[in-house]
Amino acid sequence: MRNRIIRVAAIGLLLAGVAASSATAKHTAKKSSHLLVGINDEAFSLYGNPAAAFETLRSLNTQVLRVNLYWGGTKWAVANSRPADPTNPGDPAYNWALYDRIARYAHDSGIQLMFTILFTPSWANGGAGRTHPPKSFTALRDFAHAAAVRYSGFFNAPAGQLDTTLGSGTLPAVTMWTAWNEPNNPIWLAPQYVRVGKTWRVQSAYNYARICNAVYDGVHSVLISPERGPVPDEQVACGVTGPKGNDAPRTSRPSVDPLTFLSAAHKFGMKQFDVYAHHPYAAAGNEPPGYVPKGKNARRIQLGNINVLLNEVRRFYGPKNLWITEYGYETNPPDHTIMGTSWTKQAQYMRQAYAIARANPRISMMLWFLVRDQPQIGGWQSGLATVTGAQKPAWSVFKSLPRG
C-alpha cells in the first residue's frame, strides 16, 4: 500500500491517513498477565434495546463486548451500497448508525467494544453471496481503514451521518478488531476447498490469508496525524477459528480443522496480526473444560488442548497472545441434545473454564457467548439467562469472576 494522507471531508475535520505498507510496519502483540472478561451477544446489544442491554452488561461487570461490524450482506450492514470514496467514513453511501450508537453506549458504560468485520457486499463479489470473499481485497482493506478512522477516537461525523439524540462531537474509540468469524466453517466463509489439478486446496485459508492482511493493513494504516502517528493500542486479531473441521473436501459440507487452517493460512501468505483468536467450544455438554480430545478428534481444539494451537501460533508467528472471542455451554433445559448440560453444571464449567484461561499467560481475553438464550431451539442456549430473562446460576458466577 503506497504512502498517502487522506483528509476526510466533514464538519470538525479530523486527519486520518495511510501509513507505510503494513508489510514493513512493526506491531507487536501486547503481553498480558491478566484476563479480560466479556460477552459476545449482538442480538442483545447491537440491534436490541441498547439502553436496557448496557444496564445489564454493566450489572454483569462486563469488560469487553464483541459484535459484528457488517461490511455487507445483512440489513445491518454499513456498505450495502457501493461508496464512491471507500476510505472516507463520511461517504454518504455508508450507514454507520447502529455502530455509532453502540460505540457511544459502550463508551458511556465503561465497556471496551470489539468489532468483527464480516460479510461481503454483493457489489464487491459480483453477487456471489455474503460468505464469499471480495474479488478485490483492496475493497476490504479500504473499508477496514474507513471503519478504523471513524472509530479512532479522533473523528467527528458529518452532520448528515450523526444521530444527535445520542450526543455530538467526536465518536468514541474502538481499538479491538477481528477479521471475519470462524473462517474454517462454511457457514461463514465459502468455499472451504477447491480442486487445483489433482489436489484439493484449502480455499478458505487461501482467501482468509488475504482477509486478515486486508483488515490488518486497513486498521493499522490510520494515523491521528503524521506527527502523532497511529492510534494508540490498536489491535487486530486474526484466526477467529471454530473448534473443529472434518477435512473432507468431497463431502456436502466440508470444513477445516483449526490446526490445518492455521498452517494453510500461513502457507498462503497470512502475514501478521497482533493477536490470534479462537473459539474452543467443547464437543458435548458432558465434556468439562479441561477435557482433551483424542483419537479422530485430536485435531479439534478445545480449552483442554489449547496449548496445541498456541504452540502452532508460536511456530509460525512467535508468542502471540490469544483471545477467546466465543465460549460457552448450552443448557438442558431447553436444549435436550447432546450439547445441553444442566444449569448447575454450566455454572461449574464456567468457573473452571475461566480459571484455566486465567492460568495461561498467553490467553488475555475470554468472552462468553450470549447473555440470553436464542429464541429458536436450533440456535444457541448458552445464555446466562433464559429467553424470558430468568437468570441461570451462571449469571451470578459470571458477575463474580476475577477481572483483569
Q: What is the meaning of each model-derived region?
A:
Residues 1-9:
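Bacterial N-terminal signal peptides that target proteins for export
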Residues 9-18:
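Bacterial N-terminal signal peptides
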Residues 22-25:
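Boundary at the C-terminal end of the N-terminal hydrophobic targeting segment
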Residues 27-179, 184-203, 241-243, 252-253, ...:
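N-terminal substrate-binding region of glycoside hydrolase catalytic domains
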Residues 32-37, 60-67, 107-114, 172-176, ...:
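Loop/turn elements at helix/coil->beta-strand transitions in domains of secreted/extracellular proteins
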Residues 47-51, 141, 145-175, 196, ...:
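Noncatalytic carbohydrate-binding groove/subsite architecture in carbohydrate-active enzymes
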Residues 132, 173-178, 183, 188, ...:
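Aromatic-rich peripheral "rim/lid" segments of glycoside hydrolase catalytic domains that contact
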